[in-house]
Amino acid sequence: MSDRQQVTNAKGERIAIVAGLRTPFAKQATAFHGVSALDMGKMVVNELLARSELDPKLIEQLVYGQVVQMPAAPNIAREIVLGTGMNVSTDAYSVTRACATSFQSAVNVAESIMTGNIEIGIAGGADSSSVLPIGVSKKLAHALVDLNKARSFGQKLQIFRRLGIKDLLPVPPAVAEYSTGLSMGQTAEQMAKTYNISRADQDALAHRSHTLASETWASGHLRDEVMVAHVPPYKQFIDRDNNIRENSVLESYAKLRPAFDKQHGTVTAANSTPLTDGASAIILMSEGRAKALGYQPIGYIKSYAFSAIDVWQDMLMGPSYATPLALKRAGMELEDLTLIEMHEAFAAQTLANMQMFASKKFAEEKLGRNRAIGEIDMSKFNVLGGSLAYGHPFAATGTRLITQVCRELKRRGGGTGLTTACAAGGLGVAMILEVE
């Protein structure tokens, strides 16, 4: 059996990425304060359809994701269909795979095209860290259920008497792993210590990311892939990411205190991604359908792979497990790639993965390979800056990476690009894109 992955339909047509778009990414409680993930999702899909001059009625499937779920709209994909002029019969469902969510939505739509069930679909994701589902304590939740069954005033009073003041306090969404109690930042700190990644190296990577992102915006390269977002009450707009440190100065990073290990830590707010609001989406078609409609695809999906590892140690090492799978399925080696784009959740996590890419010992002991994945050529790596600068709305990052890599490869005259990300739960993803 061949190891090669056939990302084509029954006619042998490739899966085309016709267009991609995102909102600007904004730090928590800034430009998108009060704007839900659903509203941002509708905003970007509407604009993507308008810019592409694609009739919404032609969309056969929409798969969309959200990590921080809103109880009022649990199926964000269906609500986007109803809010963007598509047929009410359009197939729509929601997915979640932590920070790899919109990679998952893209793969789901691609596989629907591969099987011949559809020819045109939209994939993406959105998250808001400003509009959050604030919960209640377990004791209060239990009491509220009991209140529904209470008949008399006395019964209701007895239920309330079981509650203390602390039981009435709101409960924000969890930031830790359910199974371990560890946060992403604590895991990044563990990886920094395990792999001897210095504070100086983390700060240097963050500085590089912000500098390149600032230069990329100044060059105008992102104007066609980032929309102008007008937000209620429509007296202002946001047209660029607001986390990027313009005129970044490396020395200033050293001033920040460690965020997760106050005494001996090296992970800080400056070398980590901030809580971010934003949305992104891509249009996928069969190659033949794209040609028939007159579209020039920005890229094609060549291969993809997901991985899962233990959550107690090195939980954010997903790229080092998923990448060799995607490369093998594409019949490629790391050195064959034109560009390499790795999601920078934390500088420590990124540097640890880069270290493992180059490690023969890791390849032999963890991957069952007789050679390392490969040393990363920094002239190919995150050439426009990364998530440390742009920010990270959890479900939106995947399709941001896909669009950004395809468009940058197009500017360079074509080639192949790797997009890869870690995700909560010990998950990882890698996707190889090709551009003509």
Swiss-Prot record:
One of its GO terms (biological process) is fatty acid beta-oxidation. It catalyses: an acyl-CoA + acetyl-CoA = a 3-oxoacyl-CoA + CoA. Keywords: Acyltransferase, Cytoplasm, Fatty acid metabolism, Lipid degradation, Lipid metabolism, Transferase. The keyword Iron does not apply. Its main location: cytoplasm. It is found in: Cytoplasm. GO terms for cellular component: cytosol. Pathway: Lipid metabolism; fatty acid beta-oxidation. Its EC number is 2.3.1.16. One of its GO terms (molecular function) is acetyl-CoA C-acyltransferase activity. The active site is at 99 (acyl-thioester intermediate), 392 (proton acceptor), 422 (proton acceptor). Belongs to the thiolase-like superfamily. Thiolase family. HAMAP family: FadI. Catalyzes the final step of fatty acid oxidation in which acetyl-CoA is released and the CoA ester of a fatty acid two carbons shorter is formed. Heterotetramer of two alpha chains (FadJ) and two beta chains (FadI). This is 3-ketoacyl-CoA thiolase. It comes from Shewanella baltica (strain OS185).
